[in-house]
Amino acid sequence: MSSPLDLYECVTAQGETVRSIKAKKGSKEEVDAAVQVLLQMKLDYKRVTGQDYKAGCPPQDGVTPQDGAAPQDGEDQVDPWSVSSSSAKGVDYEKLIVRFGSSKVDQELVDRISRLTGKTPHRFLRRGIFFSHRDMHQILDAFEQQKPFYLYTGRGPSSQAIHVGHLIPFIFTKWLQDVFDVPLVIQLTDDEKYLWKDLTLEECRRFTVENARDIIACGFDVNKTFIFSDLEYMGASPAFYRNVVKVQKHVTFNQVKGIFGFTDSDCIGKISFPAIQAAPSFSNSFPQIFGDRKDVQCLIPCAIDQDPYFRMTRDVAPRIGYLKPALLHSTFFPALQGAQTKMSASDANSTIFLTDTPKQIKNKVNKHAFSGGKDTIEEHRKLGGDPDVDVSFMYLTFFLEDDEQLEKIRQDYSSGAMLTGELKKSLIDTLQPIIAEHQEKRKHVTDDIVQQFMTPRKLHFSC
């Protein structure tokens, strides 16, 4: 394995290569290929050092890996801190289901959700974006028997602006809340970001409030939704902290090292944090909502990179007298430069932020969205494009509601009838109004509204 310093120097050199190609006005394909190599190098650097690459800041001596054992040769890297794939199509989710031991969201499950709710399945279910689950049938059994359950999802507030990829779990959770008419708790893990990132507590608090505004702008029902900051709620809720301590007592250091790859040089806050992310899975962590009830099951919609936290939670739950939480896992929202990694707020060029203007959205898509098209118009007309690696088409699968229109775009692009520029225009025309609408809704989220959502209180739900 290369040393951290060797990797740092390789990333630096590749960055110079990218800049040189751009300065010489190299072809788009040449630039994209060089950028892909750079992104992969940065991922390798982070996997080995546990740090994001920063120009002019070589790694310190003694840096050790923080994300556990590397995947087997040819396997995708998927954990709570990094996601990468060597395939232009992105992560192989069928293999990931086998590797993680979860169950596929099949048509039978989608049909059952539709039948019980009386609603058309969300496009994320229809298109396999939420592709994996744990015990979702138990949640549907409870719903069928008119027993209550609740939703739990979260966000790590590491920056003031969130990007379109962050919207995915909240869009789907909002739909679940609406069709099942159930309460929802949203954990903002500001403590986690303080422990993992170079941030002050004050910055974490500010990011928490700003991220809460974006979440509220998704349209959640204030009467059924409680948003909480770990740094605030932990000190205000003895019941929540008791559950944290129960989990801490029943999970060994050796277990969390095996699950999360912690090392002897990690601060003790990191080692104990998984118990804090586990605690919202238990209904009596929220006595203001559920009283002391332990029998209200939890459903967690999340990206599959969060699954290690909840595998641990599901393992410990029966040993401390609680129900195992159920999960629905989503695929990753790819970076603009390609599906080999997920969108990240740390790279402005790979990211479309919810604060971007229509012009910025257009420029980012046109300049940076990886294309599955051919090198020339003539070749593209003859051979067609590849929607399976084309980022613009991937984004449309997330945001374009009309299934027939999406399929027509797929066919036209694959046949060569639609050019890359036309496909990108379809994406731009889809994204711009969605982000503009979100920005308008966010303007109306006042400090008082944020306070309402973040105040511990009774929520309305059917027992």
Curated annotation (Swiss-Prot):
Any one biological process term the GO annotation gives: tryptophanyl-tRNA aminoacylation
Motif ('HIGH' region): 157-166
Keyword line: Aminoacyl-tRNA synthetase, ATP-binding, Ligase, Nucleotide-binding, Phosphoprotein, Protein biosynthesis
InterPro entries xref list: aa-tRNA-synth_I_CS, aa-tRNA-synth_Ic, Rossmann-like_a/b/a_fold, Trp-tRNA-ligase, uS15_NS1_RNA-bd_sf, WHEP-TRS_dom
Ranges spanned by the short sequence motif 'KMSKS' region, renumbered to the chain: 342-346
Disruption phenotype: Knockout embryos show morphological phenotypes such as small eyes, small head, and pericardial edema.
EC number: 6.1.1.2
PROSITE patterns given in the database record: AA_TRNA_LIGASE_I, WHEP_TRS_2
Domain WHEP-TRS: 3-59
Short name of one Pfam family: tRNA-synt_1b
Record's GO cellular component terms: cytoplasm
Catalytic activity: tRNA(Trp) + L-tryptophan + ATP = L-tryptophyl-tRNA(Trp) + AMP + diphosphate + H(+)
UniProt-listed NCBIfam families: trpS
Function noted in UniProt: Catalyzes the attachment of tryptophan to tRNA(Trp) in a two-step reaction: tryptophan is first activated by ATP to form Trp-AMP and then transferred to the acceptor end of the tRNA(Trp). Could also possess an angiostatic activity.
Protein name: Tryptophan--tRNA ligase, cytoplasmic
Annotated source species: Danio rerio
